[in-house]
Amino acid sequence: MAQSINITELNLPQLEMLKNQLDQEVEFLSTSIAQLKVVQTKYVEAKDCLNVLNKSNEGKELLVPLTSSMYVPGKLHDVEHVLIDVGTGYYVEKTAEDAKDFFKRKIDFLTKQMEKIQPALQEKHAMKQAVMEMMSQKIRQLTALGAAQATAKA
């Protein structure tokens, strides 16, 4: 369990360390959300592609991707069944409707994960802002103290 720290009791180097830690946490959470969005977009695109599979397109010629930049000609033979990548190199044959349901569940799961991360990211942003404001306040205090000492010596 995380312990609560009163930032008013920390000195400038400690505040700087805390700010750096919060920067890293914000970066990690932001990257996590971005990665989840990329995966979610791929699932949305895959689900949308299933809408092209219908009886009127059966027998039509198409380009089949072998890699991200290499395609070979092919014919759409079976519009009722598809192979979907379920991860780690495994593919499963499903009906087009089952595949749409699979992608919908994945999209919903990723949305929920992003919704769980978002509040933590906002909390870290707020904490970082509070630390930066405290640092500014301490710097102003030190500057004022230094100016007061300089005028007292003069």
From Swiss-Prot:
Gene3D superfamilies: 1.10.287.370. It comes from Pongo abelii. This is Prefoldin subunit 5. It is found in: Nucleus. Binds specifically to cytosolic chaperonin (c-CPN) and transfers target proteins to it. Binds to nascent polypeptide chain and promotes folding in an environment in which there are many competing pathways for nonnative proteins. Represses the transcriptional activity of MYC. GO terms for molecular function: unfolded protein binding. GO terms for cellular component: cytoplasm; nucleus; prefoldin complex. SUPFAM superfamilies: Prefoldin. Transmembrane segments: none annotated. Belongs to the prefoldin subunit alpha family. The modification N-acetylalanine is found at residue 2. The modification Phosphoserine is found at residue 56. The modification N6-acetyllysine is found at residue 42. Heterohexamer of two PFD-alpha type and four PFD-beta type subunits. HAMAP family: PfdA. Keywords: Acetylation, Chaperone, Nucleus, Phosphoprotein.
